[in-house]
């Protein structure tokens, strides 16, 4: 079993129940999934660019990403409907906990000038979004093998009803929130 999953089951659940006073154990917030999205803007001119992004995301997550396509044409962006414009991966279960563990303990500390993640990136429904500027912070990515520095969005979807509950859940996992 993943280290963070064990920590959740043994410590975090009890702490959340004590703090928020849940009557039913099914009310306790839990991490549902982590979605990692990589937008590849240059894919409109160069269709091969998407392959490198897919490879990077596969190396980081250990799961094959799905290529996302444009929903509609936008002339200002030189975008046609159905063109590949990015890729995303949805992690659940043990893979999700393993990824979160690596993100918190290995990748985030490698970010330059890192003072913690923003505590304001919650969406009001208990989901947290984190933007990363470069894929190099993950140790699985080799510096010499990449063609271009790419960023990604990481969305942590929880079953929490409010941002406060979700913040406590992620803090329990060890997410380093910045103090205002």
Swiss-Prot record:
Keywords: Ribonucleoprotein, Ribosomal protein, RNA-binding, rRNA-binding, tRNA-binding. PROSITE patterns: RIBOSOMAL_L5. The keyword Ligase does not apply. One of its GO terms (biological process) is translation. It comes from the Bacteria. SUPFAM superfamilies: RL5-like. GO terms for molecular function: rRNA binding; structural constituent of ribosome; tRNA binding. One of its GO terms (cellular component) is ribonucleoprotein complex. Pfam families: Ribosomal_L5, Ribosomal_L5_C. Signal peptide: none annotated. HAMAP family: Ribosomal_uL5_B. Belongs to the universal ribosomal protein uL5 family. This is one of the proteins that bind and probably mediate the attachment of the 5S RNA into the large ribosomal subunit, where it forms part of the central protuberance. In the 70S ribosome it contacts protein S13 of the 30S subunit (bridge B1b), connecting the 2 subunits; this bridge is implicated in subunit movement. Contacts the P site tRNA; the 5S rRNA and some of its associated proteins might help stabilize positioning of ribosome-bound tRNAs. Part of the 50S ribosomal subunit; part of the 5S rRNA/L5/L18/L25 subcomplex. Contacts the 5S rRNA and the P site tRNA. Forms a bridge to the 30S subunit in the 70S ribosome. This is Large ribosomal subunit protein uL5. It comes from Moorella thermoacetica (strain ATCC 39073 / JCM 9320).
């Amino acid at each position: 079993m993943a280290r963070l999953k064990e920590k959740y089951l043994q410590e975090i659940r009890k702490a959340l129940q004590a703090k928020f006073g849940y009557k039913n154990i099914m009310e306790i917030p839990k991490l549902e999934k982590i979605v990692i999205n990589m937008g590849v803007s240059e894919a409109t001119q160069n269709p091969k660019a998407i392959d490198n992004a897919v490879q990077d995301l596969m190396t980081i997550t250990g799961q094959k990403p799905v290529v996302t396509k444009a929903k509609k044409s936008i002339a200002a962006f030189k975008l046609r409907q159905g063109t590949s414009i990015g890729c995303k991966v949805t992690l659940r279960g043990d893979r999700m906990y393993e990824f979160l563990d690596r993100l918190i303990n290995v990748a985030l500390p490698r970010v330059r000038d890192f003072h913690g993640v923003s505590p304001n990136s919650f969406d009001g429904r208990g989901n947290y979004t984190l933007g990363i500027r470069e894929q190099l912070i993950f140790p699985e990515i080799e510096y010499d093998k990449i063609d271009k520095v790419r960023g990604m969005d990481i969305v942590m979807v929880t079953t929490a009803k409010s941002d406060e509950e979700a913040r406590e859940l992620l803090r329990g996992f060890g997410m380093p929130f910045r103090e205002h």
